[in-house]
């Protein structure tokens, strides 16, 4: 009933379990992922969690820059007027613990994810051109206990804008922003109509889920796209993220019928 996911991962051989929650803030351009790491072996664990970023800023891998930012203790990807700030915190404090910046798909360069295979990133401070990055968090998990981290990616038009979002996240707290987003989407899907009260619960759940999925295909400016589908780029070199007047009108009409006029 909300656009906050829950994903559970288990590795029996390592004796670890992860619970992840993903959300995009409903007000600000920030993506969050929380990760809880549980020990299932009854002993102290030293765990490294890595996030890899293959960003082609403004849809081109040419002329990108990425650098470690001492002010925020995060990593910044940018080109022209498009900026992404990658950051997080674990139980020990704010900021990333490790990072790697480097070339991707240039000669023999496969990408910085290779640097994570030994559990230690090289901390190169800056890279330019066709680049990618990896950030890492060091976690100490007690026996039969858990460790926590939250990761975020903020988007903006200037460095000041993304750094300001980072400050806002620290002031408000990531979990508070995620909880607020979860509550907002629950309210969006909570449509109180007599005809909905009479249908089976599984059908009503499908209705709410469908309403939320439809909302993910609509821009805050009002554009209703046909399908936010990217996999056809590999086959046809195109997406289906077009705003068709007919399709948009049908969706807007359906939203009007359930009282979501602000979106339609």
Kindly label every feature range from the protein language model.
Residues 12-19, 23-32, 36-239, 261-263:
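Acidic/polar, glycine-enriched structural segments that form the non-catalytic walls/loops
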Residues 1:
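Extended polysaccharide-engagement surfaces of secreted carbohydrate-active enzymes
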Residues 209, 242-257, 261-264:
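Well-ordered alpha-helical segments within folded domains of soluble proteins
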């Amino acid at each position: 009933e909300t656009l906050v996911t829950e994903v559970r991962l288990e590795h029996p051989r390592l004796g670890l379990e992860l619970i992840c929650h993903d959300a995009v803030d409903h007000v600000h351009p920030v993506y969050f992922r929380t990760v809880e790491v549980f020990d299932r072996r009854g002993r102290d664990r030293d765990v490294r969690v890595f996030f890899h970023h293959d960003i082609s800023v403004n849809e081109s891998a040419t002329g990108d820059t990425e650098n470690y930012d001492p002010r925020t203790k995060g990593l910044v990807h940018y080109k022209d007027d498009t900026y992404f700030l990658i950051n997080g915190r674990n139980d020990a404090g704010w900021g990333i613990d490790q990072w790697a910046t480097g070339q991707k798909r240039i000669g023999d360069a496969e990408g910085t994810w290779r640097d994570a295979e030994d559990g230690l990133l090289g901390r190169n401070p800056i890279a330019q051109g066709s680049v990618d990055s990896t950030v890492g968090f060091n976690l100490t998990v007690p026996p039969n206990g858990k460790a926590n981290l939250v990761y975020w990616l903020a988007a903006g038009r200037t460095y000041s804008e993304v750094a300001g979002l980072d400050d806002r996240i620290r002031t408000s707290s990531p979990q508070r922003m995620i909880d607020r987003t979860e509550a907002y989407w629950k309210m969006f899907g909570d449509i109180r109509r007599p005809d909905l009260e009479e249908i089976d619960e599984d059908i009503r759940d499908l209705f709410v889920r469908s309403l939320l999925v439809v909302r993910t295909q609509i821009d805050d400016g009002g554009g209703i796209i046909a399908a936010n589908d990217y996999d056809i780029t590999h086959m046809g070199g195109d997406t289906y993220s077009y705003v068709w007047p007919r399709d948009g009108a049908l969706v807007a009409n359906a939203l009007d019928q359930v009282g979501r006029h602000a979106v339609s």
